[in-house]
Amino acid sequence: MTRSAQWLHAWLLLLPAMALLALFTHYPAVATLWHSFYSTPKGARPVVFVGLDNYRQLGEDPIFWQALSNNLWFALGTIPASMALALLMAVWVNGKVAGRGFLRLAYFTPTVLPMIAVANIWLFFYTPEYGLLEQATGALGFATHNWLGSKSTALACLMVVTVWKEAGFFMIFYLAALQSMSPHLAEAAAIEGASRWHFFRRVTFPLLMPTTLFVLVNAVINAFRLVDHVVVMTRGGPDNATSLLLYYIYEIGFRFWDSAYAAALTMVLLAVLGLAALAQFWFLDRKIHYQ
């Protein structure tokens, strides 16, 4: 096969994936950016070019800034917790423990449940006076508390649900990485007299860095795309205390029908995710050993 034939064959193999990527990713992104510079047609008013007006509106929108702040706190609360719990569970079920298969199933089960089902399960836990959490705290002598109806606890309650949902998913990747490691490494460390903690810190965790980067990227994306739990459990309340960026975009676009402003919000969300991804690869990729 000639070089030109190889080149043509390679591009033909890539063409279906490139077409799907362009159709469902690149074109919507470019169309959203274009739409963010225009107004939303309403009634007899046609679409007009407004330039950066939609972006200027962001600076004067207090709900946007609150949603952005909520999302940043949500990310800071869920990403480290879900990753640490996933790593702990993976190390636990990778060892020789009784009922290892049952533990793996139990840890992974929340991942396969639909998001709406998970939200409804936790609604039962958080129900005032009758919920499981209320029954437990009441037995300990604590006063009744509306967990999802209080601004001080509503966002934290969503964080708990998210960590419970995602930790099992991330555990699978850590478990696969642990099982791909050579057992001779642990044997050599034991001969040298290294403790388990020293072996984990100096050998295991550095070898897990490629997996950690992959999990971190997914955790950041998940933290900024959550909308199901918010819709079912709080609808952004109380007083926008649990309104996250994607939920706010959903409200602007489909409740208030302001598609142009929603497009501008979407571009801000894409910019936040892009900057987060660049920062992760810039700081972590240089510390990763792939071989």
Question: Where are the regions a protein language model picked out?
Answer:
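Short, Lys/Arg-rich, polar N-terminal cytosolic tail immediately upstream
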Residues: 1-5
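A structural signal for multi-pass alpha-helical bundles of membrane permease subunits
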Residues: 6-291
